[in-house]
Regions:
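Bacterial N-terminal signal peptides
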Residues: 9-17
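Consensus positions within tandem repeat domains that build extended binding/scaffold surfaces
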Residues: 90-93, 113-116, 137-139, 159-162, ...
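Structural signature of tandem-repeat unit edges
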Residues: 50-56, 75-88, 98-111, 121-134, ...
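Surface-exposed repetitive/solenoidal architectures
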Residues: 25-99, 116-118, 586-588, 651-662, ...
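Feature responds to low-complexity, polar/acidic, surface-exposed segments characteristic
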Residues: 242, 674-692, 700, 705-752, ...
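Sec-dependent signal peptide cleavage junction
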Residues: 16-28
Length: 876
């Protein structure tokens, strides 16, 4: 055991012999002069860790990479003593000496090099000697324990960041005679809360006090120049800049969150760029009468600035100069000539602003985002409403546009949701993209006769617009130009129109028909998609590019089907022979349940049947080559697909997108679909009559049947019980528990249906004890029953729109209990009135014939969300 212990001690002693004692591997002295062989300055380190320099003249400069001869001993150095005679301390001489506690500098010292004492974390105080003329960049940067500093009056050249990021520095004495404070000199010194600027000071460098804790400031009359961001982000609460300052640069006092008042002395001709931007507590500003210009971003993002007096001498307002301020009122001098882009944008409290007539230069987005602005006037000299001028002014109700204006810029009135009407001058020839996008309250609009061109989405989303005439000078309708104009019910297109862009009328849900001029040679895809009430598209016979077949838009050659009107009567459609391609969104939102494609079909484009959720059966030919992405809704009711080709060929069609159809769809291979037609079942049903689509729908859906044999009796009476029975069938004939108070229900076939309708609140009877099941249902009664079914059974609110019944000569004769339901049914297009030589009459108490009831039921079906199956279709 003793031998083992001895061996361990021997090994340890050998290892310790290899480890040098403190400074043993470092020279304890040496030369570091900048002159000749360097012997003009010598250095020594004593056992206490004091590094002493002696000699005359300049010390050598070093770099962070090269290091100093004493560098490896840096962490052991406790003090630095530079003796008299030495004139220059070299760059990086004491860089990152974390334990140095004191520095003694001689009166002979003239300059201190770059980063000489940077990151000396132990240094707490520093007295720079009089006679020092130059401080290099970052000389004392990040001396984070430094608390007290004296700056001599003799400094002439001060580098950047000399005392920046000294987080503990709180006591600074600037000697009289000092003329310049360097760039970023005290930047980031958050404990520096007070400082007295000497009367000799002339220049405050860029960012000199940036992000310091300064709370008070007195600028001496001697100061003539304050450079950019000099006091940015300080804790100042009040500032007065005297007129003796001749140069005040950008953002000098920006981001001072505690600054409440600011005075700019007489003599200043401009408020510099960003001078007070983001001063979030600023409330009071005093400007000089000598002022001529308020520059870019001068007061931007000062939300508490609610009022300001602008001198009459001001002629120019820069970009975003007052954006995002809290100003409620603003009076611009009559001599104003220039207003920069977004000068008054995003001011949530500004309600009104008058632009003087002298303005000749008007930037983009001047009022954009002023959410409280209700009215504004524009200068008579204006020839263009620039881009985004009033964009997102959600409370703007009126604007007077001068007659001199010839063009409306991009997004000029975008999202002005309260704008109800606007008078466009006769001279306007161009309205750019999205100029009136989402102006939801705009109900009246007369486009100028001189208009020649429109931009994409120029009037998209104007959901209140009801009628529109496009002037003859317009040759092209660009993409989405009137998209989502949901109330647009009347449209006149110019006779010389040559093209209709993609989605031009997409979402115009109130248009029932559209006539395409013979001159049109180009129609973009989706031009007429998502038009819920569109029943027919018309094209003249002389059009060389397009044709319509039974209201459906096709190319002149008949090879591409471009648009199927979503509200075209009928639930089935046989695509015409010769069609090879179904265009993108061609059947958007259609109420079709059955579609059969011709043998010529090759391609169904992307989203061709988007939102055609009522589809239940499709018939494809064997030659089909492509079915586009999301051509059919995955969540549709499609239950059967008939395909003329093989199972392998079908797999090749759908393999790239496994869920083009519902997962439970049944595919019938090498066969086609046969669907019975009402005209083939009943001898008194005419396939060309106005009521045929409704009859065909109700028969195929099992909602109505014949009255015996091959007779349907279209003009026969529809009873109250029959209507209730149809809705009961539509609901899947749910189980009924309980009865009714009605004593006149004598037949068995309608007992459950009427009990169900009574218990669900769909009907209430003609009295407390009678229902009159065999009485003919009147037009107003069927309206009440259908609206009740939508609300009580389907939980759907169809009451958003109500028609004005006074438009009908007999509108006043509608019973009070039925008035709302009839107004809703008319607005929804379920009841349209009967045309006579004396006008269009509602005939509310008139009986609804079977063909009328069938048509109303089909229209109702297109509006409600209810699953339905066709009664019968067979494979052939």
């Amino acid at each position: 055991m003793k031998k083992k212990l001895l061996s361990i001690l021997l090994v340890l002693s050998l290892m310790l012999a290899l480890v040098p004692a403190a400074f043993a591997a470092e020279p304890a002295s040496g030369t570091c002069g900048a002159e000749g062989d360097g012997s003009n300055v010598t250095w020594t380190i004593d056992a206490a860790g004091t590094l002493t320099f002696t000699g005359t003249g300049a010390m050598r400069d070093y770099t962070a990479q090269s290091g100093t001869p004493w560098g490896r001993s840096g962490n052991a150095i406790q003090a630095v003593v530079v003796q008299e005679g030495i004139t220059h301390i070299g760059a990086y001489a004491f860089f990152y000496y974390t334990n140095c506690r004191s520095v003694s500098l001689p009166s002979s010292l003239v300059s201190i090099g770059e980063s000489a004492f940077a990151m000396n974390y132990g240094l707490t105080q520093l007295d720079l000697p009089e006679g020092l003329r130059k401080l290099g960049d970052m000389a004392f940067m990040s001396c984070r324990a430094l608390e007290r500093l004296t700056v001599p009056s003799t400094l002439e050249k001060i580098g950047k960041n000399t005392f920046s990021s000294c987080g503990s520095l709180s006591n600074v004495t600037l000697s009289e005679g000092l003329t310049v404070l360097g760039r970023l000199m005290f930047s980031g010194d958050r404990q520096l809360k007070n400082i007295t600027l000497p009367q000799s000071l002339t220049t405050i460098g860029a960012s000199a006090f940036q992000q310091t804790g300064l709370q008070e400031l007195h600028i001496p009359a001697s100061v003539t120049k304050i450079e950019g961001r000099a006091f940015e982000g300080t804790a100042l609460t009040s500032v007065e800049v005297p007129g003796t300052v001749k140069t005040l640069l950008d953002s000098a006092f920006s981001s001072c969150d505690n600054l409440r008042s600011f005075t700019l002395g007489e003599g200043f001709r401009s408020v510099p760029n960003g001078l007070l931007s983001r001063c979030r507590s600023l409330e009071r500003v005093t400007l000089p009468q000598s002022l001529e210009k308020i520059d870019d971003y001068a007061f931007s993002e000062c939300p508490r600035l609610t009022e300001i007096n602008i001198p009459d001498s001001v002629t120019t307002f820069g970009i975003r100069c007052f954006s995002r301020t809290g100003l409620r009122e603003l009076t611009l001098p009559e001599g104003t000539t220039t207003i920069g882009g977004r000068a008054f944008a995003d001011m949530p409290d500004l309600r009104e602003l008058h632009i003087p007539a002298a303005v000749t230069s008007f930037g983009i987005g001047v009022f954009a985002g002023d959410s409280s602005l209700t009215t504004a006037s524009l200068p008579s000299s204006l020839t263009e409403i620039p881009e985004s001028t009033f964009a997102f002014c959600e409370k703007l109700t009126s604007v007077a546009i001068p007659d001199s204006v010839t063009s409306i810029g991009k997004e000029a009135f975008k999202n002005c949701k309260s704008l109800t009407a606007i008078d466009l001058p006769d001279a306007v020839t161009f309205i750019d993209a999205s100029a009136f996008l989402d102006c939801q309250s705009l109900t009246q609009l007369q486009l100028p006769s001189a208009l020649e061109a429109l931009g994409d989405q120029a009037f998209g989303g104007c959901i209140g617009l009801t009628s529109l005439t496009v002037p003859d000078g317009v040759r092209k309708l660009p993409s989405w130009v009137f998209s989502s104009c949901q109330s647009l019910a009347s449209l006149t297109l110019p006779t010389d129109l040559t093209s209709i862009g993609m989605g031009a009328f997409h979402g115009c849900r109130s248009l029932t028909e559209i006539t395409i001029p013979d001159s049109v040679q180009s129609i973009g895809e989706m031009a007429f998609a998502n038009m819920a009430r569109l029943q027919a598209i018309h094209v003249g016979a002389d059009n060389s590019a397009y044709q319509t077949v039974d209201g459906v838009l096709l190319t002149k050659a008949g090879d591409v089907l471009l648009a199927y009107p979503a509200a075209r009567p009928g639930i089935r459609y046989d695509v015409p022979d010769g069609v090879t391609r179904i265009g993108e969104r061609a059947f958007y939102g259609s109420g079709l349940m059955i579609v059969r494609f011709p043998q010529s079909l090759r391609t169904v484009a992307d989203e061709a049947f988007k939102n055609s959720t009522r589809l239940i059966a499709l018939d494809f030919p064997a030659g089909t080559e492509e079915i586009g992405t999301r051509a059919f809704n995955r969540d549709s009711n499609i239950s059967d697909v008939f395909f003329g080709g093989t199972e392998d060929a079908w797999y090749q069609l759908v393999k790239d997108e496994a869920y083009k159809f519902p997962l439970d769809v049944q595919v019938h291979y090498q066969t086609s679909m046969v669907v019975p037609r009402a005209a083939d079942l009943f001898t008194d049903v005419d396939a060309d009559s106005w009521s045929y689509p409704g009859i065909d729908f109700c028969v195929l859906a099992g909602l109505m049947s014949g009255v015996g044999g091959d007779t349907f009796l279209p003009r026969g009476v529809t009873t109250r019980a029959q209507v209730v029975q149809i809705l009961y069938n539509l609901s899947g004939e749910p189980a009924v528990a309980g009865g009714t108070p009605f004593t006149d229900l004598t037949a068995d076939w309608y007992q459950d249906a009427i009990a169900w309708a009574y218990q669900t609140g769909v009907v209430s009877g003609t009295s407390a004890t009678t229902f009159e099941p065999e009485a003919p249902v009147t037009r107003e009664q069927i309206a009440v029953i259908l609206m009740g079914y939508a609300e009580q059974v389907l939980s759907m609110d169809l009451s958003a729109d109500k028609a004005d019944l006074t438009a009908f000569p007999d509108g006043a004769s509608v019973s009070d209990w039925a008035r709302d339901a009839v107004a809703e049914a008319v607005a929804l297009g379920l009841i349209s009135g009967a045309q006579t030589k004396d006008g269009t009459f509602l005939q509310p108490q008139g009986g609804a014939t079977r063909e009328q009831a069938a048509t109303i039921l089909m229209g109702f079906y297109t509006l409600v969300d209810v699953e339905m199956r066709i009664l019968e279709y067979d494979a052939q």
